[in-house]
Amino acid sequence: MAKILYMVVEHFKNQDAVAVYRRFRDCGRMAPEGLVYVSSWVDEKLERCYQLMETHGRALLDEWMGNWSDLIDFEVHQVVTSQEATKKIAPRL
């Protein structure tokens, strides 16, 4: 089974980045085995994080989000790389 990339947009509840970073410092990412962190970016106001995650299925992602749902509202998008998108669109060009 191929791995799936997910772009996860994390909206920090009450714009409280301190609570999120404190938990991360104390507990780590709290990701279940099989869910791989790829990279992340945080907006300048420290209100949201754009995080790229990789796994074989959505269940592990849902489990991980459950560990953070008291501090973060999540928006999830399944994504492909630009190279994969180019291959998908090529027959239509």
Q: Where is each model-derived feature located?
A:
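Extracellular/luminal beta-rich ligand-recognition
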Residues: 51
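Conserved short beta-strand edge segments in small beta-sheet-based binding/regulatory domains
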Residues: 71-82
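Short, flexible helix/strand-to-coil boundary loops that buttress conserved ligand/catalytic motifs
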Residues: 65
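Short S/T/G/P-rich N-terminal loop/turn motif that feeds into the first structured element of a domain
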Residues: 1-48, 56-60, 80-93
